């Protein structure tokens, strides 16, 4: 698959997602792994990175510290706005006033305690399963 096709797919997802986001406080975004050049690129993580780059008042949460570090090194402009679940409570609560959008990678890993901290209700669409990675964007 050509790289411009991948970028086009990501752009389509972002455009569609933002249109839906304007009409709702909570957005669930389905995405899939993009395969190209014999490798794999996570569609949902790539979409999250693109949204973080576009919206300076957004905060990103990923599964592990190593993923957060790798993304931060690759994209220094979003380094101070991407965190792992381990640092989630202090990262989010300590800077809540700074951010008006939270982008969460693999939302199904959240616990009820995390849900209470975010002050949101986790709703999973019937079309999604726990095997499908997705992103939640929440307006504070």
Model-derived features: where do they sit?
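Charged/polar, solvent-exposed surface patches and flexible loops
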Residues: 8, 12, 16, 50, ...
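Structural motif
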Residues: 61, 101-103
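Intrinsically disordered, low-complexity regions
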Residues: 19, 79, 83, 119-121
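Short, Lys/Arg-enriched charge-dense amphipathic segments
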Residues: 47, 56, 103-111
């Amino acid at each position: 698959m050509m790289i411009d096709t991948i970028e086009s797919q990501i752009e389509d997802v972002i455009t569609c997602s933002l249109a839906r986001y304007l009409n709702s406080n909570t957005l669930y975004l389905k995405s899939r792994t993009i395969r190209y050049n014999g490798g794999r690129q996570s569609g949902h993580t790539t979409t999250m990175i693109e949204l973080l780059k576009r919206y300076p008042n957004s905060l990103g949460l990923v599964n592990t510290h190593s993923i957060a570090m790798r993304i931060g090194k690759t994209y220094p402009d979003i380094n101070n706005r991407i965190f792992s679940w381990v640092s989630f409570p202090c990262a989010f609560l300590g800077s809540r006033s700074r951010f008006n959008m939270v982008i969460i990678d693999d939302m199904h890993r959240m616990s009820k305690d995390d849900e209470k901290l975010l002050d949101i209700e986790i709703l999973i669409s019937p079309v999604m399963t726990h095997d499908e990675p997705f992103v939640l964007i929440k307006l504070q």
